[in-house]
Amino acid sequence: AARTGRMSITDPPLQTLPRGRVVRDAIVARPGHCFVMADFAGMEMRVMASFSQDANMLAAYARGEDLHDFVAKEIYGIRFTKQERTVSKNAGFAKIYGAGIPKFAATAKIDVQTATAFMEQYDSLFPGVKTFMESVVAEVMERAGGDRRKYGYIELIDGRRLPVEADEAYKGVNYRIQGSCAIVTKEKIVEMDALGLGPYFRLAVHDELLYEVPLELAEDARRVIEAAM
């Protein structure tokens, strides 16, 4: 497992398969079975909304909006392009993973000046997120006694503590969100087991759970998953 408690799979690395169909099409269900997937639909951004309690972010989710569509619409206008949505999505994950402006610009394929301006607009749109991130850094530093050579810590949704190097206190945001997502995922695996899907569980890929069920049980499995998610 990763430091945050996020599950990690190696040999083969099924969570990081190459994009495209060549490799992925090699993974098939057994005869008489099919795959049924439970998807948490942008869990990390939802956890960010929960922790930050940002009013605009919570309102967008309450309306059932796709958050990245919402950001693109607010910043670029209602006729935003696919590329502009990608930039909006990259900005959200740059916040979660602590990426600086140069990294965000490179990932989003925009210049640094444009990336800087975009992040300023993003912070204006979601001021609660900026405040939350600053508070996490401050908490880590305070718990380290203000000494950058020491460790502070962050708390996950279940109260578990994760140590964070004070010199890299910004990582506390990612640890708190990713670690909390890992807890939610594992709790959901246990819940699905209690609902009878345990024997069919095959793989957890971060915010997705993959089940291999007999064809005659596929619809029942789908209903169970929909009710539980």
Q: Model-predicted segments: where are they?
A:
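Alpha-helical scaffold/interaction cores of sigma-54-like transcription cofactors
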Residues: 1-6, 97-101, 112
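Acidic, glycine-rich two-metal-ion catalytic cores of nucleic acid-processing enzymes
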Residues: 1-79, 142-209, 221-229
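Catalytic palm subdomain of template-directed nucleic-acid polymerases
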Residues: 48, 100-113, 209-226
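Short Gly/aromatic-enriched secondary-structure transition segments
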Residues: 51, 117-120
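Residue-level preference for well-ordered alpha-helical positions
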Residues: 72-77, 94, 105, 109, ...
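Short, surface-exposed acidic
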Residues: 76-87, 111-118, 129-132
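Short, amphipathic alpha-helical "recognition" segments used to contact nucleic acids or chromatin
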Residues: 87-97
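Polymerase palm active-site segment centered on the conserved acidic dipeptide of motif C
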Residues: 120-138, 216-229
